[in-house]
Every structure is written in structure tokens, then in C-alpha cells.
Amino acid sequence: MIRVVATGTFDILHPGHLYYLEESRNLGDELSVIVARDANVKHKPRPFLPEDQRLRMIRALKPVDHALLGDLHDMFRPIAEIRPDIITLGFNQHFDEEHLRQKLRERGLDADVVRIPGYPGSLASSSKIIERILNTRGPPDPTGSHGEE
């Protein structure tokens, strides 16, 4: 059995997330997803949705066999427990593949690291969705326009 692990924040779940998880699942027989803890999200703005809600939504997705919250102190602990054959990264995740492979090997983990390409649609990231919401549904400008397309 080929075990795959996907990781992410998964804030404001969107088609790009689903694409990432579907493509990750296609690489193996079992997909486990590690959802970032609120306290550990430091490389971008804090999530809008609390970690328990993000975890619940990920668990409900068809491609996902198992989902869990990441460890508060050691991001490699859940990976070591799962012992995946493959770890996938999203197109915009900040990890360097070779550095991650090295860190895994230091812990006795021999998982391949695969970067999944971006979703081909226009709303492939939470930041793009937020930007579009603000541009199309934000407060009206002084001229009376609502910024709608």
C-alpha cells in the first residue's frame, strides 16, 4: 500500500485545495492530510477559520482517508507516525523539496517529496478569493459603484 501525506492550512476551502488533495490521492492508495495548527501558521496571516473547523471540512472530502491536526511543537511527529511513501506539497507551499527530503532522512524517513502543480482555475488560492470578494462585494466606492464586474 502506498501512503501519501498532504499538508496545509486549508483556510477558506476552495477548488485549488480540492485539486491538490485529489492529485495527492491519485499518487497512492491512502491519503492522510495534516492540517496546520492555528498557532503554527506563521508564514502568512492567521487563518480565518479555527483549526477544528478546517480539520472537520478536510475530513469530509472524498479523496481524504484520514485527517489530523499537526503537532504544536514538531511538524515531523505526525509524519513519523504515518510513515508515508510520498509527501505532497502544494504549488505555493513555502517548503523547499530537497531541504524537506534531507530533514526526513535525518529522522529515518525515506518518503519521496512531490510538488503538485497549481489548480488551472482563476481562483486557485485563498488570497485570490479574498481579493475578488473585496473587489466585487466590498463597500461601495464614493462614486456609487459597487466594484461589480
UniProtKB/Swiss-Prot annotation:
Pathway: Cofactor biosynthesis; FAD biosynthesis; FAD from FMN: step 1/1. Keywords: ATP-binding, FAD, Flavoprotein, FMN, Nucleotide-binding, Nucleotidyltransferase, Transferase. One of its GO terms (biological process) is FMN metabolic process. ATP binds at residues 9-10, 14-17, 92, 119. InterPro entries: Archaeal_FAD_synthase, Cyt_trans-like, FAD_synth_RibL, Rossmann-like_a/b/a_fold. One of its GO terms (molecular function) is ATP binding. Catalyzes the transfer of the AMP portion of ATP to flavin mononucleotide (FMN) to produce flavin adenine dinucleotide (FAD) coenzyme. Belongs to the archaeal FAD synthase family. This is FAD synthase. It comes from Methanoculleus marisnigri (strain ATCC 35101 / DSM 1498 / JR1). The gene is ribL.
